[in-house]
C-alpha cells in the first residue's frame, strides 16, 4: 500500500483513482462496507482504491484535549486499511488551511487537480469542507 502525506506530495502518478474520504478511526464494519464498495468500483475502473484521511482528526483539531480518544493510532489505521485491500492512503494535515477550505476548493484542489478521481464512495451522511458545507450532492454536482 502506498502512503502519501500531504496535498503537496501528490504527484502525476497519483492521478486517476476511486476514492473515499473520512477519518476511518477503528475501521469498523461500516467502514469495511464502504471500502469493499470502493475496491469493487476501483477494480471495475482499473484504477487504485484510495482512502483520504486527516491528521489530526477534525475533532482533535477543533476540540483539542476534549476530543474523544482515538480507537486506533495512525499506524494502526494504516495497517487496518492495508489489510482491507486499499491501494493508497492520502493523509492530509488538518490545520487552519484545511479548516477554512470550502467545498468547491476541496473538490477542485484535491479530487480534481490532485487525484483526478473517477468516482467517490462515501457513506449516506457524508459531509466535508468548511463548516461541513460539502455533501453527497456537492460531489454529484462536481461529477464525482
Positions of the model-derived regions?
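Nucleotidyltransferase catalytic core that binds NTPs
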Residues: 1-144
